[in-house]
């Protein structure tokens, strides 16, 4: 049996496909890849906030829906909280480090005033503004290699990236891992997901064999939190769950740059229920602070 995988054509995306493919080969399944151009690729200089939702996934998922591929592979943080009803999560593989990192000569608390940090994420910009209001942020687009090249050529004094991207691309560069209480990561950061057609039972069964259960539970809990509060890759909300045994440890944060709210939860149970509880806690605090009605 051979699985046809749709994915973006970027270097990072191809590495992620091969990570999934390696798991498939271990159970005797071969794979091929179809490279898909997405809106994010076609408008690579536009700020992500202007491109709308689903810019990294829409065209890739359409290839699966149209039968051009069996499954789609994504960085899970890039897929919308509400997946197309004809699609389903077939698998996630074991999570890479979920943290944000700062690539700069000094750590965040020691950076010089008026330092310029490259990031296009509203969440990251707001966390920086809250922690170090005298530091500047500037939009940056392009793949990871391009961003690092811009940093090394002094276009930026620093960058904020996902640690997982550096690890997957095997990039050797010094960085500072950001504390999750200062910089709560985006939901599902560090997770690679496989989406497939809901009715395709044969392919679905294959991917059940490579799913990492604890990672899936963490992913579902984080998505439940975001579903309650409202958010996505253009949202200033961070959420992270870690599962140890039967216990879930979760943290969620919101910042508008002037104030910051952080809530946490620790309990055993169903990931959806626990994630929803954390979302309700954050929503309650946001109402108390007058951020939402």
UniProtKB/Swiss-Prot annotation:
Cofactor: binding comment: Binds 1 dipyrromethane group covalently.
Alphabetically ordered keywords of this record: Porphyrin biosynthesis, Transferase
One GO molecular-function entry: hydroxymethylbilane synthase activity
GO terms under biological process: heme biosynthetic process; protoporphyrinogen IX biosynthetic process
Domain of life, per lineage: Archaea
Family annotation (Pfam families): Porphobil_deam, Porphobil_deamC
Additional comment: The porphobilinogen subunits are added to the dipyrromethane group.
Family under the similarity heading: Belongs to the HMBS family.
NCBIfam families in the record: hemC (TIGR00212)
Full protein name: Probable porphobilinogen deaminase
Species in which this protein is naturally found: Saccharolobus solfataricus (strain ATCC 35092 / DSM 1617 / JCM 11322 / P2) (Sulfolobus solfataricus)
Gene that this sequence comes from: hemC
């Amino acid at each position: 049996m051979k699985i046809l995988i749709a994915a973006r054509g970027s270097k990072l995306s191809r590495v992620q496909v091969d990570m999934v493919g390696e798991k498939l080969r271990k159970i005797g399944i071969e794979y091929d890849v179809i490279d898909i151009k997405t809106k994010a690729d076609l408008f690579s200089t536009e700020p992500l906030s202007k491109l709308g939702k689903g810019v990294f996934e829409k065209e890739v998922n359409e290839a699966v829906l149209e039968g051009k591929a069996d499954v789609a592979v994504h960085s899970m943080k890039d897929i919308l909280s509400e997946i197309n009803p004809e699609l389903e999560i077939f698998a996630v593989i074991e999570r890479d480090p979920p943290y944000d990192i700062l690539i700069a000569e000094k750590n965040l608390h020691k950076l010089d005033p008026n330092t310029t940090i490259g990031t296009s994420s509203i969440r990251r910009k707001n966390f920086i503004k809250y922690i170090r209001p005298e530091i500047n942020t500037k939009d940056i687009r392009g793949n990871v290699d391009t961003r690092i090249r811009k940093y090394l050529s002094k276009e930026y004094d620093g960058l904020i990236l996902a640690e997982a991207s550096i690890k997957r691309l095997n990039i050797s560069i010094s960085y500072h891992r950001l504390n999750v209480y200062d910089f709560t990561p985006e939901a599902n950061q560090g997770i690679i997901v496989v989406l497939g057609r809901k009715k395709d039972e044969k392919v679905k069964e294959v991917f059940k064999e490579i799913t990492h259960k604890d990672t899936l539970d963490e992913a579902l809990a984080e998505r439940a939190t975001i579903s309650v509060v409202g958010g996505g890759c253009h949202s200033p909300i961070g959420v992270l769950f870690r599962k140890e045994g039967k216990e879930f440890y979760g943290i969620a944060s919101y910042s508008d740059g002037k104030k910051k709210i952080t809530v946490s939860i620790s309990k055993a149970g169903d990931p959806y229920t626990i994630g929803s509880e954390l979302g309700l806690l954050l929503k309650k605090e946001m109402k108390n602070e007058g951020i939402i009605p």
